[in-house]
Regions:
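Short, conserved sequence motifs used for protein processing/export or organelle targeting and
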Residues: 195-198, 203, 207-364
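Beta-rich carbohydrate-recognition modules and glycan-binding surfaces
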Residues: 1, 16-17
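N-terminal secretory signal peptides that target proteins for export/translocation
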Residues: 1-10
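Sequence context of c-type cytochrome heme-c attachment sites
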Residues: 30-194
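A broad structural signal for short, well-ordered beta-strand segments within beta-sheet-rich domains
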Residues: 2, 140, 333-337
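Short Gly/Ser/Thr- and charged-rich N-terminal loops/segments
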Residues: 13
């Protein structure tokens, strides 16, 4: 009983000290007191490597908004998703786990530094990311991108922290960060970036937001709002940001009583990688060319598929032309509409993320 009371008093005493320090830091502009508080390293266990790492849920106690975004992202489900489980024959292929449940991407950075290879780390020979064998359900978790080999959490900002913290703004704002796992897409990016478009992966897939890094008490009182990024990692945010990233256009339409023929022109206008992109998994983009009657019913249709494996993807700045011919039936005198739809799909056609759509009214 005495031991329990002593522990309670210690916790209360530390909490009281922190409250006083927080108030003083706020009043003084957070200068000296911020440095003092950070140097105290109150929770070093948060930055433990290996099985001792407490898990992303622990990070979510303070980084509430970021954790919620990550929890709803595909990164958090990179190991537990049915697609990954089936594709790896129930996790038989360990090579894939290195990126779907990494210890930390800095194992690759460490290897690159030791070998003194002066190239982007994603191209460093014999470098690799180490796979976790613990807490696999978290997939690409917080430590995967933020925990260094020196047991420090790194990121683009500095500030008050109860755990070791290292600022690395340049790396966290570069596509090289994402390229440690998304190797093939990053190589495409290196090939095409600079041709009038210098946007990084983060610019499109991590929407900008101004907020405090943490929302929990009392730490949030020591933080000011900063420009940051949402941790959603979504293709939908990229589409929302660049609504005309790919353009569809009907050209050379030949319209008569017997048939309608023409072309659909596709241009990858604003993306620094191919559409689709990536080496692993089922990645398909579908083009549907539909002929509709005056009631909106599809009476004729043609489908074109684009795969990286077949080298039919649309590269940055590339224009592809797909021809179509629709023979007309006895309703050819009715008003019809041509429609072209471009969307991402998966193997069982449950994913139909719309990329672009164009319509052309026809008078017969």
């Amino acid at each position: 009983m005495i031991h329990k009371l002593t522990g309670t008093r210690t916790i209360l005493r530390i909490s009281g000290v922190l409250a006083v320090v927080a108030i003083m830091a706020t009043l003084s502009g957070c200068g000296l007191f911020q440095k003092m508080l950070t140097s105290m390293n109150i929770h070093p266990e948060l930055a433990e490597r290996g099985e001792k790492f407490p898990g992303s849920y622990k990070c979510g106690h303070c980084h509430i908004d970021i954790y919620k975004e990550w929890e709803g992202s595909t990164h958090s489900k990179s190991y537990t998703s049915d697609k990954f489980r089936i594709a790896t024959n129930n996790y038989e292929y360990g090579f894939c786990i290195r990126c779907h449940a990494p210890k930390t991407i800095f194992t690759l950075l460490e290897k690159e530094t030791v070998d003194n290879i002066d190239v982007p780390v994603t191209q460093a020979k014999n470098s690799e990311i180490a796979a976790r064998d613990y807490n696999l359900k978290d997939g690409v978790d917080c430590q995967g991108c933020h925990l260094t080999v020196d047991c420090e959490f790194s990121g683009p900002h500095e500030g008050i922290s109860p755990h070791p913290l290292k600022k690395d703004e340049e790396f966290y704002k570069s596509s090289e960060l994402c390229g440690t796992c998304h190797v093939d897409t990053f190589e495409e990016y290196l090939t095409y970036v600079g041709n009038g478009n210098d946007e990084t992966c983060q610019d499109c897939h991590m929407p900008a937001v101004r907020r405090k890094l943490i929302q929990d008490e009392p730490w949030q009182k020591l933080h000011k709002k900063k420009e940051g990024k949402k941790h959603t990692f979504s293709r939908l945010s990229a589409i929302e940001k660049n609504k005309d990233f790919v353009r569809l256009k009907f050209t050379e339409i030949n319209n008569n009583n017997d048939q309608i023929a023409g072309n659909v022109e596709i241009i990858n206008t604003k993306v620094n990688h191919s559409i689709p992109t990536g080496k692993y998994g089922y990645r398909e983009v579908l083009l549907l060319i539909n002929l509709k009657d005056n009631l909106g019913k599809i009476i004729k249709s043609k489908q074109e598929s684009m795969f990286v494996e077949l080298n039919t993807q649309i590269k940055p700045g590339e224009k592809k032309i797909y021809s179509f011919v629709f023979d007309l039936d006895d309703k050819s005198g009715e008003l019809k509409e041509l429609e072209a739809v471009l969307f991402r799909s998966n193997f069982n056609r449950t994913d139909k993320t719309l990329f672009a759509k164009v319509e052309l009214q026809l008078g017969l």
